[in-house]
A protein has these predicted regions:
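Feature recognizes metal-dependent phosphohydrolase scaffolds
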Residues: 1-668
C-alpha cells in the first residue's frame, strides 16, 4: 500500500494543474472548508419528466411552476396573511413575470397605488425567495444572482437584524428601488431566481420530439437550464440521425411531422426547405385520392383550409414512399437488424394490388405508386434523388437543429444513473422467460447493460464519425434501428406498424407487441435484477418512460413492488383521453420521493390572464427516515474526492514540491 507522500508524488502533475486554481495553502484550505460545509447541506431537489412530445406550453408551465412546488412555497409564506386570489396572482407573476407584470400594473389607479403595489410585491417575493434559498449556501445563491442587481438582492436575502430594524432597512432599500425606476427589473429578477432555486436538477427521460407543435421551444429552454440530463427516447434519436444527414431518418421525421400537420415547425423553426418535396409530390401524386394521407389535426391549432390539408397530404404520401424505399435499403445493408420481414415494397403484388403481411395476403388501401418500378421497387428515380439531396443539405445546414442535436448528444445518453436511481426511456429487452434478451451486432453478443452501452456508443458514431466513413453510415443506420428495431431499448416493441396502418384495413395487422420487459417489470425480483445489472442495490429505483400509464383504467405508475416508476402520464394532447391525465413529475427531495399527477393544461394565455394553474395531485412514494444530505449523494462523492485532492495539494505545498505563487495573510 502506498504512503501518503508516494501518492502525492505520483499525482504531482495533476496537483500542479490544480494549483493554478488554488495557488496557495490558504486558498486550498479555504476551499476545503467551503466544500466540507457543502457536504452537510440537504440534498438538492430533483425533478424527473418524460415524453414531452413537443408539447411546449404544458412543459413551460410545469417548468415555471416547478410542478406545483412554487405555489406550495407561496402558500407556506403567505397563506395566513394574503387572500387566495392574491396568492394565485403572485404565483402567476413568478411563472410568467414578463407577461403578468404589465397586467398587474395597469390595475393600479394612480402612482401612489402603483408604488404601494411595488412595495408589497417586492417584499413578498423576497420572503418567498428566502424560503426557496434556505437549502443553499450564500455563495451558491450569489452565483445565481444577476450581476446588474446581485449585491442588492444578496443584501435583501441575507441581511441580519440583531442591531437594526428589519422593516426600516427593507423599506429603505425597496423605496430606493422604486424611486429609481428599477422595480420592474427587480421583480423579474426575483421571479427568475425563485424558479432557479426551486429545482436543483432536471432529468428528462426521453421523447422531446414527436407530434407536438414546438419541440424547438422545449430544447431552447433546456439549453438555458442550469443542470439537466436527458435519456434519449426513440423520437429523439431519429431526429439526431436526421441532423447527422441520414436520409432514412430525415424521411422518417418528415413523415411524422406531416402526418400531424406540424411541418410548419420544420420549415419555420428549423429553416428546412420543403419546396422541392412539395413540387415533386404535386408532380407525381397531386391527382391521387389522398384520403388516407390527410393529416391528423388539432382543432385548438386550426382552422385548416382545404389547400393547407392538400399540401400536407400530398407531401405526406411522397415522403412515405421515399421512406419505404430507403427502409428496404437500410434493411439490406444491415442483416444484423433482423428486419427482413419489414421490406414491404418487395412484398406487394403489383398486379393484384395486395401485400403480404405476416404470411397473409391483404388488399391495399392505396395502389398508386407512380415512382416505384416493380422490377426494382427500392430504386429512387431521378426526381426523388434530387429531393433527397436537397433535404439532406437542408437538415445538415440548419444551424438551430445542429445546436439542438449537439446538446442532445452532450447532455444525453441511453441510460443514466444518479443518486441510486436508474433512468432510461424504453426498456431493457427481455425474453418471455424473464432473462435479458441477447442480440448480436457486428459479430458480438450483447444483453442487459452491455446492450445499452453498445447502443449508446453506436448512436454517437452516426453523428461524430468522420464524414463519408463506413462507421458514420453504420451509426446513422443504427439510429434508425433505435427508432423502430425489435430489440431497440428505446422502442421495446415487435415492430412499428406504420405501413400496415396506412395500407391495410385489417386492424389485426396494426398490433405492436410489447417486449416481455413490460410484463416482467411488474415483478419486484426482476426489477431488483435489473438494478443489480447496473450495479445498484435492490433499494434503488428505476425511472421509466415511453408507455403511457392508463390511470383512467386504474393502472398504477408504480411497478415491481415500488422499485420502478413509470412517469409517462400522457403529456401529449393525443394521449389525454387514453390516460385520463396530462403527465407526471417525479420529485425527489431531501425528505421524500413523490409523484405529481398533472391535469390537462389549457393554455399559457389563460394561465396569464385568469391565473389558471395546472392542477396536480401529490402522491408520496417514499419518506426518508432522515433528511438526506449532500454527503450521501453522488455529488457528495465528487466533493469528497475534491477535498482529498485539495488536502494533497496543501501537503505538497508544505513539502515544497509545489511552490506557492501568491502569499496570503493566513494562519495556515
Amino acid at each position: 500500500m502506498r504512503t501518503e507522500t508516494e501518492e502525492i508524488r505520483d499525482n504531482l502533475k495533476y496537483l500542479s494543474l490544480l494549483a493554478r486554481d488554488y495557488p496557495s495553502q490558504a486558498a486550498a484550505a479555504s476551499e476545503i472548508i467551503s466544500t466540507q460545509a457543502l457536504l452537510k447541506l440537504p440534498k438538492g431537489t430533483e425533478h424527473f419528466m418524460s415524453d414531452l412530445h413537443g408539447e411546449n406550453e404544458a412543459f413551460v408551465h410545469i417548468l415555471n411552476s416547478a410542478s406545483g412546488v412554487i405555489r406550495e412555497k407561496v402558500d407556506i409564506v403567505l397563506g395566513d396573511t394574503v387572500p387566495e386570489g392574491t396568492r394565485a396572482e403572485l404565483a402567476t407573476l413568478i411563472y410568467y413575470p414578463s407577461e403578468k407584470l404589465p397586467q398587474l400594473k395597469e390595475r393600479c389607479a394612480d402612482e401612489e397605488a402603483l408604488e404601494q403595489w411595488y412595495s408589497e410585491t417586492l417584499l413578498r417575493l423576497i420572503d418567498i425567495c428566502r424560503l426557496v434559498s434556505s437549502k443553499h449556501t450564500r455563495e451558491h445563491v450569489r452565483a445565481c444572482l444577476p450581476s446588474s442587481c446581485g449585491y442588492i438582492l444578496d443584501e435583501l436575502l441575507h441581511a441580519h437584524f440583531e442591531d437594526h430594524d428589519k422593516d426600516l432597512y427593507y423599506g429603505q432599500i425597496v423605496g430606493s428601488i422604486i424611486e429609481n425606476g428599477r422595480a420592474d427589473k427587480f421583480i423579474v429578477r426575483l421571479c427568475e431566481l425563485i424558479k432557479r432555486l426551486a429545482v436543483d436538477k432536471l432529468h428528462i427521460v426521453g421523447d422531446l420530439f414527436d407530434r407536438g407543435p414546438r419541440p424547438d421551444v422545449i430544447l431552447d429552454l433546456l439549453m438555458r437550464h442550469h443542470d439537466v440530463d436527458i435519456q434519449w427516447g426513440n423520437h429523439d434519436v431519429v431526429w439526431m440521425g436526421a441532423a447527422a444527414g441520414s436520409p432514412i431518418c430525415i424521411c422518417t421525421v418528415l413523415k411524422t411531422t406531416l402526418s400531424y400537420h406540424n411541418h410548419g415547425m420544420v420549415e419555420d423553426c428549423y429553416g428546412i426547405n420543403l419546396r422541392h418535396l412539395q413540387r415533386m409530390a404535386e408532380q407525381f401524386y397531386g391527382d391521387d385520392d389522398l384520403t388516407i394521407w390527410m393529416p391528423h389535426t388539432d382543432t385548438a391549432r386550426g382552422p385548416y383550409t382545404p389547400g393547407m390539408l392538400h399540401r400536407c397530404a400530398v407531401m405526406h404520401k411522397a415522403i412515405t414512399i421515399l421512406m419505404l424505399k430507403l427502409e428496404c435499403q437500410v434493411i439490406d445493408r444491415n442483416p444484423d437488424f433482423k428486419m427482413q420481414d419489414r421490406d414491404f415494397l418487395r412484398r406487394i403484388n403489383w398486379e393484384k394490388g395486395t401485400v403480404m403481411v405476416g404470411g397473409r395476403e391483404y388488399p391495399m388501401r392505396d395502389t398508386s405508386f407512380p415512382t416505384v418500378d416493380p422490377a426494382d421497387p427500392t430504386a429512387l428515380n431521378s426526381d426523388e434523388k434530387v429531393v433527397l439531396q436537397k433535404l439532406v443539405q437542408s437538415f445538415r445546414q440548419s444551424e438551430k437543429l445542429q445546436q439542438h442535436v449537439e446538446f442532445l448528444y452532450a447532455k444525453g445518453s441511453v441510460y443514466h444513473i444518479e443518486n441510486g436511481n436508474l433512468l432510461y426511456h424504453g426498456a431493457v429487452p427481455m425474453t418471455k422467460k424473464g432473462t435479458f434478451a441477447v442480440e448480436r451486432f457486428e459479430g458480438h453478443a450483447y444483453s442487459g447493460r452491455a446492450l445499452m452501452d453498445y447502443c449508446d456508443e453506436r448512436a454517437r458514431r452516426g453523428y461524430f464519425a468522420p464524414e463519408g466513413s463506413a462507421a458514420r453510415q453504420s451509426g446513422q443506420d443504427f439510429l434508425w434501428y433505435l427508432w423502430c428495431g425489435k430489440l431497440s431499448p428505446l422502442y421495446g416493441r415487435s415492430a412499428m406498424t406504420t405501413f400496415e396502418r396506412l395500407y391495410v384495413e385489417d386492424a389485426s395487422t396494426h398490433t405492436e407487441v410489447k417486449d416481455p420487459y413490460y410484463t416482467w417489470y411488474n415483478e419486484e425480483a426482476v426489477c431488483r435484477r435489473i438494478l443489480a445489472e447496473f450495479g445498484l442495490p435492490g433499494t434503488s429505483h428505476i425511472v421509466n418512460g415511453h408507455v403511457p400509464v392508463q390511470e383512467k383504467k386504474g393502472e398504477s405508475p408504480i411497478k415491481g413492488g415500488g422499485r420502478l416508476v413509470v412517469i409517462d402520464g400522457g403529456f401529449c394532447r393525443a394521449y389525454h383521453e387514453k390516460t385520463g391525465i396530462a403527465g407526471y413529475t417525479l420529485v425527489y427531495s431531501s425528505r421524500t420521493m413523490s409523484l405529481r399527477t398533472h391535469q390537462p393544461f389549457e393554455s399559457a394565455e389563460k394561465a396569464v390572464n385568469e391565473n389558471l394553474d395546472i392542477l396536480s395531485q401529490k402522491n408520496i412514494l417514499e419518506t426518508e427516515n432522515h433528511r438526506i444530505l449532500v454527503e450521501e449523494t453522488d455529488e457528495g462523492e465528487t466533493l469528497r474526492e475534491k477535498v482529498h485532492d485539495l488536502k494533497q495539494l496543501v501537503r505538497a505545498y508544505q513539502l515544497g514540491w509545489i511552490k506557492e505563487t501568491r502569499c496570503d495573510d493566513s494562519v495556515w
